[in-house]
């Protein structure tokens, strides 16, 4: 930061619920329910902006693919709970207390605990397909973007989704292999938008 004296804002994207400077429901040890924003403000003179990591990924995807005004960005990593970012009419939906997109709290009827299912391709398919089904009946985005290392055969997911939604048209399903690039773009976009 010393090398960049004109830097006016420090921005972080973090896993979990980011609300009023506090982080909750995160797997990062030592920050649960801590007011990270206040701690950083005490140390740095720059503005501090904190965002949920998958919300910024959703915004990054939207900014680079703006033809999709309504999208759902689903992140399902190995051995972790799922998270999502929601864009409706070109706007990021964070919801009350920034809970929108916390899909790991959905009362899905799963065959095992989500943490266990997320360790195998079959389990991941079960989680992702049921989240897609729920999403379609709640938000109905035209595009669902998915990051998951354990879904190598995307055709199987498309078939499972068609099976679950046999009476309705399914959205366009898009697999991304790198979520970091979308996080970076989305974080820069949101940060610049707030600073202006």
Over which residues does each language-model region extend?
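Glycine-rich phosphate-binding loop of actin/hexokinase-like ATP-binding domains
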Residues: 69-115
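Glycine-rich phosphate-binding loop and adjoining helix at the ATP-binding site
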Residues: 1-70, 156-166
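Flexible, active-site-adjacent loop/turn segments at secondary-structure boundaries
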Residues: 21, 26, 101-106, 148
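Long, contiguous hydrophobic alpha-helical segments, chiefly transmembrane helices and signal peptides
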Residues: 14-15, 23, 54, 82-85, ...
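Short, glycine/serine-rich, charged loops/turns that create anion-binding
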Residues: 17, 55, 78, 91, ...
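ATP-binding/phosphotransfer module of carbohydrate and carboxylate kinases, centering on a glycine-rich
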Residues: 1-9, 43, 64, 92, ...
């Amino acid at each position: 930061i010393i090398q960049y004296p004109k830097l006016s804002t420090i921005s972080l994207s973090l896993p979990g619920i980011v609300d009023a400077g506090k982080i909750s429901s995160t797997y990062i040890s030592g920050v649960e329910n801590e007011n990270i924003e206040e701690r950083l403000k005490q140390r740095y003179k720059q503005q501090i902006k904190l965002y949920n990591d998958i919300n910024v990924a959703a915004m990054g995807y939207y900014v680079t693919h703006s033809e999709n005004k309504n999208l759902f960005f689903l992140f399902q990593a190995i051995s972790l709970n799922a998270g999502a970012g929601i864009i409706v009419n070109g706007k990021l939906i964070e919801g009350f207390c920034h809970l929108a997109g916390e899909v790991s709290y959905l009362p899905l009827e799963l065959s095992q605990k989500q943490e266990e299912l997320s360790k195998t391709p079959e389990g991941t398919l079960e989680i992702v397909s049921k989240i897609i089904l729920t999403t379609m009946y709640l938000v109905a985005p035209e595009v669902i973007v998915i990051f998951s290392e354990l879904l190598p055969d995307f055709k199987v997911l498309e078939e499972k989704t068609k099976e679950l939604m046999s009476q309705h048209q399914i959205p366009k399903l898009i697999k991304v292999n790198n979520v970091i690039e979308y996080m970076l773009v989305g974080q820069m976009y949101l940060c610049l938008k707030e600073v202006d």
